[in-house]
Structure formats: structure tokens, C-alpha cells
Amino acid sequence: MNKKKKIISSIIGIIVVLLAGYFGIDLTQDSKVPKDSELMISYMDVGQGDAAYIKVNGNDILIDAGPRSNSKELLEQLKAKNIDDFELVIATHPHEDHIGGMVDVFKEYEVKAFYSPKITHTTKTYENLVKAVKDEGLKTKELKGGMVIDLGEGAKFEVFTPQKSEYEELNDYSPIMKLSFGDTSYLFTGDAEKLAEEEALA
């Protein structure tokens, strides 16, 4: 299957994952993965912003954290999930509606690894996040096209974009990532627009 077909098939997974996140469905029933594996995806209610929580094979993962104005609501939702720490936190791009609440996540939880695209022009919100990452004693791991993040037991993130080191629009830094879990996959895109889509399909 070529890359374009893989991306298109992954888009179908978005519908499944949206329903799973809404209804809190455990997505382990029909996937070809070990019986002790698990996957749960929840889209958090952060108002006019984005945040997704993933539990896979014992790993707690957060993709974006919504705006700072809704960080209290985000933390309440995360607390209800009995999270001790995050194995992985991903910031897709520097817009406030995606990463504004992330500083408070770092204050509340231990974070073991932080990924973000390499940003050449930034925002004050992103600078505050970078400081929080350093205060945690972490180094930012660059998120870029071609990399794979192993999540164990047949689960992994494949990153298709960004493929360049500099873009005019901040949205174009948004990674297009496929989460594979057994024979099922789900696509995460941040605020990726036409340019990122073209890069992913190239």
C-alpha cells in the first residue's frame, strides 16, 4: 500500500477514534494485539482548543492541552483518569489554543518525555512552555517526519510531517501522526493545513 493510500485509510480511523473518545470505548476488542494490551483515547473538553489523552499499553500520553483559560477544567478531567505521570507529552505547534494549558500540566504531573516540532519563530506561550520543560529537567525531542515512536506491544506513532525546519505559518509545523495499534490506526493532525497534507502524501 503506498503512502497516499495509508493516509487515506488512516483518516477512516478518525471516525472510529472520535466515537471512542466520546463514548470512552476501550479499543482492544478486535485488534490483533496481545490480550494484556490496551488502548483508550479521549478528547478532552477544553473549550475553544484541542487536547487528546491516550492510554496505550500502560503509557499515559497527552497531545496538546487547550488554552490556559481552560487548564483547570483539563486538570480536573485528567485527575478523574487517575494518572500518576505522563510517559509522553506532545505539543503540536505554538498556538495558545493548543498549548496554553500545558504549563499547568507540567506543574501538576511528572512528564518523562516531551516532543515538539522544531520552531524557528515562536510565541510567548511557547516560550513559557519551553521554560516549564527545562524546569522539569527535560530536553525537547524534535518531532519530525520520518520518525517512529515505539509504544510497546505492537503500538507506535509514525510521524509524516513536518518535513522542513521552517514554515511561514505556525499551523504548518503541526505534525501529521498515525497511531498504530494492532491492525487498527488513528490519525492525529493538530492544525495541519494543505501544505502539511501535501508533504504527507508526497
Language model features: what each stretch is:
Residues 2-202:
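Non-globular, low-confidence helical/coil segments that flank catalytic cores
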